[in-house]
Curated annotation (Swiss-Prot):
Membrane topology: Peripheral membrane protein
Bilayer-spanning residue ranges: none
Cellular component, GO annotation: photosystem II oxygen evolving complex; plasma membrane-derived thylakoid membrane
HAMAP family for the chain: PSII_Psb28
GO process annotations (BP): photosynthesis
Keyword Iron: no
Family: Belongs to the Psb28 family.
Disulfide pairings: none
Protein known as: Photosystem II reaction center Psb28 protein
Quaternary structure and interacting proteins, as annotated: Part of the photosystem II complex.
Compartment annotation: Cellular thylakoid membrane
One Pfam family per UniProt: Psb28
Keywords linked to the UniProt accession: Membrane, Photosynthesis, Photosystem II, Thylakoid
Length: 112
């Protein structure tokens, strides 16, 4: 396994999200906000129960239950998930996951 994101355990989400990172000045806290445009978890042929967002890689699993769906004209349009990091160690672990996920999906990293 390299790295994958799931909303239902066992089912990888193929849609690659837009990810925005913020970090406190002292480096103790951070937030990663993921936005998925028309994810398969919402618009696929078989809709699944979304139980959270699970970030899986060779080191294990990171998870958040803070997942919100966006609807436009009554139709599912996207998912937003927020992952909180409360220590420099959690930040480093998250960044290792993102490095693996970026490599697996041909993504790059840009600083704002």
């Amino acid at each position: 396994m390299s790295a994958a994101i799931q909303f239902t355990r066992g089912i990888d989400e193929p849609v690659v999200p837009d990810v925005r990172l913020t970090r406190s000045r002292d480096g103790q806290n951070g937030t990663a906000t993921f936005y998925f445009d028309e994810p398969q978890a919402l618009v696929g042929e078989v809709r699944q129960d979304i139980t959270g967002m699970y970030l899986l890689d060779d080191e294990g699993e990171l998870a958040t239950r803070e997942v919100k769906a966006k609807f436009i004209n009554g139709q599912p349009a996207g998912l937003e998930a927020v992952y909180l990091m409360r220590s420099p160690e959690e930040w480093d672990r998250f960044m290792r996951f993102m490095q693996r996920y970026a490599e697996a999906n041909g993504l790059g990293f840009t600083e704002a």
